[in-house]
């Protein structure tokens, strides 16, 4: 119990310092917090967010949150499926790795804004386009971690399976994938945060269809509604944290009982 309190003390202290700095910055900018003044608030203090989170604004934020959650979950699911399959294929054949790896790196380093016009031409500015952006942004860490995890299996373990005349499928299923699972889950946790970023970025570029959190942030910004804009950004952060924590819990459930990186 005492160790848990000590472990929690650090994050709580950092959070309190962050809130204190937020107040200092908010008031040091000489914001006019009076709604009657007509002047836009640059950075609202934290307590102002609770005042702004009401009625129609709350309803719009929750609606946008559901839309962005659907986009992020769909994109992350596709990234996980495709990323693990591609990572496995690259680990089983060097020619596949040599053929795909340069293109995956090129896709990772290409600014998404350079791809968007082509996507609008091919797909249109719709839900599919948003999901495609999410997949492009989040798939790389899953592929790279899957490949790294499988290639990191100790050669002596491969020799042991070969002595038993095990097939490549058996080696993959009983040795490589279990040994690579910690790395795969690490990639999934990184991709979870990137999937939320992809969903938000997709909203900025694709303005048609139901507005997600990204479109709502733009709307509040253009209308000088700093409080609702900050609230929407915090909900986007919370969505990313939720996905990250979910994969952390799943990681503990799946491999926590036997792998030292989780069990200790």
Can you annotate each of these PLM segments?
Residues 29-77:
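Periplasmic/extracellular loop-to-transmembrane helix junction in inner-membrane transport proteins
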Residues 134, 187-238:
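Non-cytoplasmic
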Residues 145-184, 213, 217:
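Short cytoplasmic-facing helical segments at TM-TM junctions of multi-pass membrane proteins
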Residues 182, 230-264:
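C-terminal transmembrane helix and the adjacent membrane-cytosol boundary/short C-terminal tail
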Residues 132-136, 169-202, 247:
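Transmembrane alpha-helices
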Residues 104-141, 148-149:
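Generic hydrophobic transmembrane alpha-helix motif, especially the helices
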Residues 74-104:
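Transmembrane-helix boundary motif in ABC transporter permease subunits
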Residues 1-28:
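N-terminal signal-anchor/first transmembrane alpha helix
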